[in-house]
């Protein structure tokens, strides 16, 4: 998820936090009962030896990565087992699980962040499970995965029935099934099956009853204008933009139940913040008119500030002014906020939106004030100085992305300061830290948790190297920097040099074992 979809990220976090246990695969809290695993005949037990073969031998495999001590895992367990039992006769589907306290590396490889994590493997390819955590939903979701990506419709009755079954359906009308554009549509359907249900009509005469010319695509939906025909070029970019942009209402509410629909919107996404206890009739009417005029250029949604008061501040607004509006542009990797001191009216907002789309508005960067003095061995970056201190620096730069409330970050602080002190006289290396909770960082930098530590090499700032080693000694970082830096440097003392070599020797011996 793009970092600048900040609202969506927070909504996703709040939606998921109730269904996952915090923890790390390295920490087994020890109150699980592993013996019972072997009594479950319908749930496959996976480990490093059989994992890859198991997820590849079935058309669809659902894997639960869990920890025995996790309360949410214990709650899910009987529902999961019942789903496995109900699906046991279907040899194309498998339900399995991995105990992350026993198979740490396997869980790390699958990027497990909390428990339980559910992943669907379809023909060996991994996708997050996005259904409800109930027996019924698990069964339905996996059975749905087996259905063809594209249905073939042969009559008006077929089309009407298809529309009734699916709130959003996309139908391609073709003369034949060997046209290159038919192949393009089929591939697009396979890659966007979660956005809508796809079908085709392969009949020139029948197609002409629904479209002016073939091939063409029509989107049917249960809201706003029910039938929308594609009018752009018949290529992937245009079709995806058409489908994503028309799969949501002209001005719909975004909340825990709907945020997924907005996740992959390809055009700028405008968030209107309102107070649901007030009369918003005129505001909604005005913004709906703006949304209509900008159709294809932007997608609009509204957020109830009463339900999600922290969302506006996460976008960089004060959270105290309603109505307010913010635009998130994935393409520009930028966020734009309407000045809360300005009068909120149809004219002012309409012009501002037009200027945002036209590239006339400067993006908002969440940033703390730049430190008056930044002479300490560990440099402090903020949102407005990150580019200067890190990306534009000619040095190899080690950066700690932290949050002030993070306990692990607090434990690391004296060690990181010691690292800065130790390397302060090495001209080619800079040690930097940034409060990533209070400052924006470039959206292509993936921060999965705090602290995240990365080395931005002097000759390759676009591909930082993540530090995955121990954090209990500053010399661990020294060794990491020396091994990966673009510019060679000498350590401050031969004694420490010996220490690093000793660690290398120890590591080599460990690898041999």
Swiss-Prot record:
Its main location: endoplasmic reticulum. Residues 500-513 have a biased composition (Basic and acidic residues). Residues 21-147, 355-486 form the Thioredoxin domain. Residues 1-20 form the signal peptide. One of its GO terms (cellular component) is phagocytic vesicle. Keywords: Disulfide bond, Endoplasmic reticulum, Isomerase, Redox-active center, Repeat, Signal. One of its GO terms (molecular function) is protein disulfide isomerase activity. One of its GO terms (biological process) is protein folding. Residues 491-513 are annotated as: Disordered. The active site is at residues 70, 73, 406, 409. A motif (Prevents secretion from ER) lies at residues 510-513. It catalyses: Catalyzes the rearrangement of -S-S- bonds in proteins. It is found in: Endoplasmic reticulum lumen. Pfam families: Thioredoxin, Thioredoxin_6. Disulfide bonds join 70-73, 406-409. CDD domains: PDI_a_family (cd02961), PDI_a_PDI_a'_C (cd02995), PDI_b'_family (cd02982), PDI_b_family (cd02981). PROSITE patterns: ER_TARGET, THIOREDOXIN_1, THIOREDOXIN_2. The keyword Disulfide bond applies. Its EC number is 5.3.4.1. InterPro entries: PDI_thioredoxin-like_dom (IPR005788), Prot_disulphide_isomerase (IPR005792), Thioredoxin-like_sf (IPR036249), Thioredoxin_CS (IPR017937), Thioredoxin_domain (IPR013766). Belongs to the protein disulfide isomerase family. Participates in the folding of proteins containing disulfide bonds, may be involved in glycosylation, prolyl hydroxylation and triglyceride transfer. NCBIfam families: ER_PDI_fam, pdi_dom. PANTHER family: PROTEIN DISULFIDE ISOMERASE, PROTEIN DISULFIDE-ISOMERASE A3. This is Protein disulfide-isomerase 2. It comes from Dictyostelium discoideum (Social amoeba). The gene is pdi2.
